[in-house]
Design a protein with these regions (language model features):
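Non-catalytic, conserved peripheral segments adjacent to functional cores
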Residues: 1-89, 108-154
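Conserved SET/PR-domain catalytic core that frames the SAM/AdoMet-binding pocket
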Residues: 86-105
């Protein structure tokens, strides 16, 4: 899918645990301006969301497994990949693409974004998780959704 990039993350493990770099400024043309972390229980879907002003996102699953789904709103093309413990990669999503993720397991998820969130002027828009272009990409048919994502469902 044009513009979407997989960024392999090198994980260093020993008897103490592991260490991984999840962001380097040199990976991107635009600087990441905010970092967010969420915890999601197995079966949660967050999204699909998009930003009309073109915010870019980098998604990294810090613990557990997440299924990332991206929808090109112009072409209808889709991208999906399971990331996390077994597949330590970051997924870079350029602006104006709808994106979301499903918690395949309980997970800790990190978002790096190119715009700071402004609660007075949020650039947050939704595509239903069960939109015909993406509904078959999820592993669950009865996800746990936020009120916002429930209202967006078709």
């Amino acid at each position: 899918m044009e513009g979407v990039r997989r960024i392999p993350l090198r994980r260093f493990e020993d008897e103490r645990g592991w260490f991984v770099e999840v962001h380097r400024a040199s990976w991107f043309e635009r600087p990441m301006r905010q970092t967010n972390v969420s915890f999601s229980r197995q079966g949660v879907i967050r999204g699909l969301h998009y930003h009309e002003r073109g915010q870019d996102d980098l998604f990294v699953c810090l613990q557990g497994t997440a299924r990332v789904v991206v929808l090109d709103l112009e072409s209808g093309e889709t991208f999906t990949e399971d990331i996390g413990d077994e597949n330590p990669v970051g997924i870079y999503v350029p602006g104006r693409n709808a994106h979301g993720f499903e918690a395949i397991t309980d997970l800790l998820f990190c978002y790096h974004v190119t715009e700071e969130y402004d609660p007075e002027d949020p650039d947050e828009h939704e595509v239903p998780w069960d939109d015909p272009r993406v509904r078959d990409l999820w592993s669950t048919r009865s996800p746990i959704l936020s009120d916002r994502d429930t209202r967006a469902s078709s």
